[in-house]
Swiss-Prot record:
Cross-referenced PANTHER family: LIGHT-INDEPENDENT PROTOCHLOROPHYLLIDE REDUCTASE IRON-SULFUR ATP-BINDING PROTEIN
Binding site for ATP: G11, K12, G13, G14, I15, G16, K17, S18
Organism: Cereibacter sphaeroides (strain ATCC 17023 / DSM 158 / JCM 6121 / CCUG 31486 / LMG 2827 / NBRC 12203 / NCIMB 8253 / ATH 2.4.1.) (Rhodobacter sphaeroides)
Residues that bear ADP-ribosylarginine: R102
Domain of life: Bacteria
Gene3D superfamilies reported for this sequence: P-loop containing nucleotide triphosphate hydrolases
Protein name: Nitrogenase iron protein
Binding-site positions, [4Fe-4S] cluster: C99, C133
Amino acid sequence: MGKLRQIAFYGKGGIGKSTTSQNTLAALVEMGQKILIVGCDPKADSTRLILNTKLQDTVLHLAAEAGSVEDLELEDVVKIGYKGIKCTEAGGPEPGVGCAGRGVITAINFLEENGAYDDVDYVSYDVLGDVVCGGFAMPIRENKAQEIYIVMSGEMMALYAANNIAKGILKYANSGGVRLGGLICNERKTDRELELAEALAARLGCKMIHFVPRDNIVQHAELRRETVIQYAPESKQAQEYRELARKIHENSGKGVIPTPITMEELEEMLMDFGIMQSEEDRLAAIAAAEA
């Protein structure tokens, strides 16, 4: 068994991060890789398609029921899913109470101390990325996740979140070994989406790993709580995820320290692509409409 690769999928809420990560990991396990998924999103939906079940009980929830995390056994929190993928969800507190990041820290420490990382090739963290607060940045900050893949699209807020996540990676890149593996663009069919994703990758100094086309088969599979790899293994979309998995597998050691841009530079880039109007153009358009 080679060196353990600790990867993380970050991205803004609703971008399709959990779906993309689970389909990619299902493709990786087909390639003979042994995988542990650590869900770090309070929604606790990072393992649903691999386990083919409703939401998994989280480490924090089980610890609260048992009395403390020390009262848990590894088999209480790790479930086995598609082709032997190990799955666990860190979980988070009740909305409005406490820090969700604390659950991530508690869960990862428990898993490491109890041998969950011992016989796997990949540990994959699925992390909420709108807020790069201390807790959610923990897999980066504590030098756990070494390769970060940002799931984004051509939408303004997805680009903004991707740049913000790159800032978080840069902050910890020198003190730890964390690197940006690259961008994964989940197609939303916005204008000039692939070009825009490639332009942002160039500005961040990283690769555009893969452009995942939009396909309704993803939703059909999700309704059955399955990945596309499991639901429609011969489909074109399954091949896209296999290609993405292959690119990530071959990207070992090729991550970069990102070069995030300012908000002004991001807006300028969007203007260059005609996605966003400058204030002058906006006012001119209003004046023309009123004339």
